[in-house]
Amino acid sequence: PAERICPQLDDFDTTKTYTATDGTTYSYAEYLPAEDNQKNALVIWLHGAGEGGVDPTIDLLGNEVTALAGDEFQELFKGAYVLAPQSPTMWMDDGTGAYQNGDKGSCYAESLFELIETYVKSNEDIDTNRIIIGGCSNGGYMTMEMILKHPDYFAAAYPICEAFQDQYISDEQIES
């Protein structure tokens, strides 16, 4: 039998898509924890700027997101869903298709949140008190946009080297 080139992808379903009410279609990958009759955390990974498109394996392999399905991580969370949505272009796209500095916000902000809410509702054993969102660079930007727009929805965030410029964060947003 032939060996798989990327066996670390075996635990993920990389064939999922979601079309939001605004018409935006996302490809996404998901990892489902073992069924254990318990509520499980949801960890959301948002990719960097060069990883948009329609192939979520790029997101998973680009930053070793596959480790989130590994035994060590899953044991720490006692089982966790992993959701890795892929923007059609990049999270910092304001609708022009060009990389922008963040002052206008992302054209994907509302449709991404719709995807997340729909995903949570369709997986009843997700613990809504343990929804964690993060990503690096461009994904860190969208992490910041999500937590600033929906501060009560996410339990925690891990924006890594986020591209969100401080000048666009108000004191009121920080306090919320």
Sequence positions of predicted segments:
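A domain-start/cap signature at the N-terminus of enzymes
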Residues: 1-42, 80, 138, 164
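Loop/turn elements at helix/coil->beta-strand transitions in domains of secreted/extracellular proteins
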Residues: 38-42, 78-81, 127-131, 151-156, ...
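Active-site machinery of serine-nucleophile hydrolases
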Residues: 42, 49-109
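Short glycine-enriched nucleophile-adjacent loop
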Residues: 140-151
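The feature captures the conserved acid-bearing segment of alpha/beta-hydrolase catalytic domains
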Residues: 155-176
